Amino acid sequence: VNKRIKPLVLIATAVLLMAGCETQAGSQAHIKLKSVEEQREILETYTLDDYKTIYENVPDEANRLEKDQDLQKWVIRTLAEEKLLYDTDLSDKQVKALAKEAMEKDKLWKSIAKKKYGVIASDAEIDRYIEEGADTSGLPQHLAIAATLNMSLEEYNHGFDRDIYEKAVIWQKLKPKLEKKYNTTNNEMLAEKFDEEVEKNYKK
């Protein structure tokens, strides 16, 4: 997991679990996060209404910044993460740059998993993963971002955030291959090793 948000990774958008995080070295080196204590307080005390207040302007801001639907999704995620986790106020240019980098690295991550390791996730596998996990979630931050986007939780999970869950399924299948390659079962180390593979192949 990216060390910037490892302490309380679940308070970012959607799941942003290990398989959903991207290392954005360089682009975010200057960004200051809220302290671990502040993040913990958010996680432990924020209600559904608190999250809705945080997210309420995200869709309009994203629509102003980016019209392309694929990239706009990542702009929404970047804005949501900024409002929840960052002490640094991002400029429009920074938001768009971070969103573009995250989208490109996500595609590259999946491409390497497929082409180098032969790992993909089927629609059935993704649906099952979501149905057994995210669809049963009552986490207020998930409900709030879905409501902000005028979606039900199921629509949000199976539609908007489907790519994140696809990545989680791929990781489950990819991990045993990486364990053999790197001779370790340490999840964080494996994630870092694979992120290094992505970074080596990423062209800005």
What feature does the model see in each segment?
Residues 2-8:
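Bacterial N-terminal signal peptides that target proteins for export
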Residues 17-20:
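C-terminal motif of bacterial Sec signal peptides marking the signal peptidase cleavage site
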Residues 24-64, 164-204:
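A C-terminal, polar beta->alpha supersecondary segment
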Residues 29-153, 157-158:
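N-terminal targeting/tethering segments
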